[in-house]
Amino acid sequence: MGLPWYRVHTVVLNDPGRLISVHIMHTALVAGWAGSMTLYELAVFDPSDPVLDPMWRQGMFVIPFMTRLGIKDSWSGWNITGETVINPGIWSYEGVAGAHIMFSGLMFLAAIWHWVYWDLEIFYDERTGKLCLDLPKVFGIHLFLSGVACFGFGAFHVTGLYGPGIWVSDPYGLTGKIQPVDPAWGAEGFDPFVPGGIASHHIAAGILGILAGLFHLSVRPPQRLYVGLRMGNIETVLSSSIAAVFFAAFIVAGTMWYGSATTPVELFGPTRYQWDQGYFQQEIDRRVRAGLAENLSLSEAWSKIPEKLAFYDYIGNNPAKGGLFRAGAMDNGDGIAVGWLGHPIFKDKEGNELFVRRMPTFFETFPVVLVDKEGIVKADVPFRRAESKYSVEQVGVTVEFYGGGLDRVSFGDPAIVKKYARRAQLGEIFELDRATLKSDGVFRSSPRGWFTFGHATFALLFFSGHIWHGARTLFRDVFAGIDPDLDSRIEFGAFQKLGDPTTKRQVV
């Protein structure tokens, strides 16, 4: 036929059998990719340290999505929280991966069948014997079925009525586990961080979809609306389908980047705004002050801080620190976290506590500045020693650690103090193993960043596709140069497939 690459999809115009075939093949490819990618990730995933080397640090992409839906066990005998598993069964990572691969194979065979047997009676009007697709009715069927699936997910899977529930955690990502969720029917259900909204919104949207589907199955569109919106043209279906996809992509890009109950910190890593706003730092400070109020020593108060919480308060886990074109997992950048060294407290020679100013997200380098509780600069690591007034040596800065591996260890050597001041710019200080993976020391983004970038980019592309195909179907006669004052009762382009012998060649 000699079609250019960007027009090859015209081969399925006015060929509903093969249109179905290519969609089934697409489903086969998607399901096959999901299953295969899961098996690959399971082959490289190390579940031994869910606190300092969680899935998102290792660059896992599909495992977090499976986990948030209630899968936590592996046939290898481990689960995502670090416990030992005896009999994981089918509802496991390998079980679901295998199911997707088997489903992909069945879809592949179905696609071949529909490609070979494309000319089915169901596509023809029994009254006229001509090719006829009732697209509004097809829309109603799809809407009804998607409504049933949506309602079923919210009413059964999420609530635990028939299913495991979903991943639910506290606001600081410390106690996450899979559990049933009760629907939130009040105003709190609109809070994106309330898991109950997931159940209630799926139930409500499912009911709406079922009712809308029944409406479109039982009520015919007015002729003026049918003609005006080109409801008989398959390209109208393409345009509106692309609109649904790009809208969904924009939504999930937002919920992933800004955070929500659907994108837990434990599965996808912190958001950049949690670093920008000092979210975890403030919680750590609150816990330390609460410990001191209970007459605990500084060492005891800091030792009670969970290592998991301290690790979140480290800039290397900020998804905006890694460049989008730096390939690889976070562990390939700054290394595998081995342990928390503790919280450094800096003091000048008068004993006044100093605080290291933290690096903002979009800086690669940042001056090392130490300020007092009023925010006044008291010490720094100068760029030019000859002009320095606040150098560590001149001010007599010392550092002492509380909690972690260096608990109650102090340093007065200026070189060591400056080393830890530089590292304190990046949040809590951790020992990082760069040798195992030959990590290069350059920050990487987390799956949260990759997902957002991919979905926002494709949403923009699909938005353009929606405009393109919508304009083509609405203004097809204009683009083709048909006289707008033509009185003949014809629908131009009813048969527009190249080489179609049924195309009418005479003017009606």
UniProtKB/Swiss-Prot annotation:
GO cellular component: chloroplast thylakoid membrane; photosystem II
Protein keywords: Chlorophyll, Chloroplast, Chromophore, Membrane, Photosynthesis, Photosystem II, Plastid, Thylakoid, Transmembrane, Transmembrane helix
Top-rank lineage group of the source organism: Eukaryota
GO BP: photosynthetic electron transport in photosystem II
Keyword Transit peptide tagged: no
Homology family: Belongs to the PsbB/PsbC family. PsbB subfamily.
Role this protein plays: One of the components of the core complex of photosystem II (PSII). It binds chlorophyll and helps catalyze the primary light-induced photochemical processes of PSII. PSII is a light-driven water:plastoquinone oxidoreductase, using light energy to abstract electrons from H(2)O, generating O(2) and a proton gradient subsequently used for ATP formation.
Topology term for the membrane: Multi-pass membrane protein
Oligomer status and interactors: PSII is composed of 1 copy each of membrane proteins PsbA, PsbB, PsbC, PsbD, PsbE, PsbF, PsbH, PsbI, PsbJ, PsbK, PsbL, PsbM, PsbT, PsbX, PsbY, PsbZ, Psb30/Ycf12, at least 3 peripheral proteins of the oxygen-evolving complex and a large number of cofactors. It forms dimeric complexes.
Any one Gene Ontology molecular-function term assigned to this protein's record: electron transporter, transferring electrons within the cyclic electron transport pathway of photosynthesis activity
InterPro entries linked to this entry: PS_antenna-like, PS_II_antenna-like_sf, PSII_PsbB
Record protein name field: Photosystem II CP47 reaction center protein
Subcellular location: Plastid, Chloroplast thylakoid membrane
